[in-house]
Amino acid sequence: FKLSWLAPTAFYLEVGGELLRGNHFPSAGAANGQGAWTLFSKIGGDMGISTSWQAGVSYLSTDVVGRPSNTSSGEFYGDSDLFGFDFVIKWAPLGNPRQRNFKLQGEYFSRDEKGVFDGSEYRGDQYGWYLQGIYQFRTGWQFGYRYDRLKADNTGVTDTELDPMGRDLYRNS
């Protein structure tokens, strides 16, 4: 079930929420058909004739019932909450992106999990972000750069088979 409202304003403003089964990651088990819910808001607009922007915030709360691990036979039971912020800025000469355009976008997220994994208390905090820019300099030709980073502080599972290294990952691409 999704409910959203697009405000009748001179700029873009949408707010909404969803009730979900919660059968897929980061949730699991569908919690009797009501395992997850979201809230979101997006705002955006034009900056002159060639540039537009949009930013948003979102929140996802899930009840996790028996989510399996990828690396062991244990399962997680508890709560998983995810907060996110995203933005995008687009530029195209005179608003026409066919020949040339540039897009800069990024996102930040933070996830907090509390519960029980394989009979032991578990608390996991993960956060990550990415920033990327893509420039199309000619029809069919573009180049870009992306940097992303992920940090996981999974108290209770660090140095176990679930998280053997206490990960802090990054990538350039």
Regions found by a protein language model. Give the residues of each.
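Aromatic- and glycine-enriched pocket-lining scaffold segments that form the walls
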Residues: F1-V64
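Outer-membrane beta-barrel pore domains
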Residues: I49-S173
